[in-house]
């Protein structure tokens, strides 16, 4: 069964109300790749649908971006920075915590929209995490770590791996649920990569917008693609903006 993102996204759009009369989001881009630009387009479409004004600006230098942040954040409910050039830090560390709607920094009151999206998908389709063995192939502060924290709070047994983990498939092939977010193209291409009946959620996206998993080659029955996760992530991002 495909865990489609659209019905999850639609439910979030319909039920999450704004605490502000005029919610707005500032999207800053620094050396954006194709994935960043695709995400921006999705954010703009979603903002138009749910009534969140979206302003985007691309900065060429970090210092210029810091200045823009300091001068512009007070005019927006939330701020996100799309800067895949940096794995951490960069402009994101200068976002005020109360405006940090994508959980870029530890003091943010929100998890990242992507991490929340994975949990929303699992909840929507009635996946009980208690007692399940979950393997997360990502150790980042915005995806892997918050997901591990949330899943542990649901009494799952969580193993966190990454692209450098030795014999990675030894872990994924034993998991009840796999969430992968490497973003370097097809990483899993064999039926042996996952056990029969496992749920596989692909969050990864490379420069050609390909995910981490070749679902057909792996013969995965229960799955969500990066497009499914992306659809829910944009809805969760807008929900965070409405809460800010």
Where are these regions (language model features)?
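Short beta-strand segments enriched in small/hydrophobic residues
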Residues: 23-31
